[in-house]
Amino acid sequence: MRHKHGYRKLGRTSSHRAALLKNLTIALVNSGKIETTLPKAKELRGYVERLITRARLGDFNAHRAVFASLQDKNATNKLVTEIAPKFKDRNGGYTRIIKTRIRRGDAAEMAFIEFVA
């Protein structure tokens, strides 16, 4: 039974899962919109929203906290200085998931995840 189980394992070890979420976040920050599988998009949503909430403060500690998660200077800078200030007056719900198609090779549900404008 999976009662009260708080996250998706995505068929990966914990370190692989952390690296996957970090890389998907960097791709989302750089491009603004990515296509991935639906479970990955749903798991990524919570990860990104916590980062944006932290980045909204915009101070030095916010930069450090975001960089600790992403380990990418360009993505960190873009998230804290460009993306997070757009959501200054918004309490959560910074991303949108749109179901797109069924992938032909393995019939996986695909979805776009993007920032709300």
From Swiss-Prot:
Q: Which residues form the signal peptide?
A: none
GO CC annotations?
A: cytosolic large ribosomal subunit
- Specify the protein name: Large ribosomal subunit protein bL17
Q: What keywords does the record list, in alphabetical order? A: Ribonucleoprotein, Ribosomal protein
Question: What does the subunit comment say?
Answer: Part of the 50S ribosomal subunit. Contacts protein L32.
A family per Pfam: Ribosomal_L17
Which PROSITE patterns does the record associate with it?
RIBOSOMAL_L17
Q: Which PANTHER family match?
A: LARGE RIBOSOMAL SUBUNIT PROTEIN BL17M, RIBOSOMAL PROTEIN L17
Q: Which domain of life is it from?
A: Bacteria
What organism does the record attribute this protein to?
Campylobacter jejuni subsp. jejuni serotype O:2 (strain ATCC 700819 / NCTC 11168)
InterPro entries cross-referenced by the UniProt entry: Ribosomal_bL17 (IPR000456), Ribosomal_bL17_CS (IPR047859), Ribosomal_bL17_sf (IPR036373)
The UniProt entry's sequence similarity note says: Belongs to the bacterial ribosomal protein bL17 family.
One GO BP annotation here?
translation
Coiled-coil parts of chain? none
Example GO molecular function term?
Answer: structural constituent of ribosome
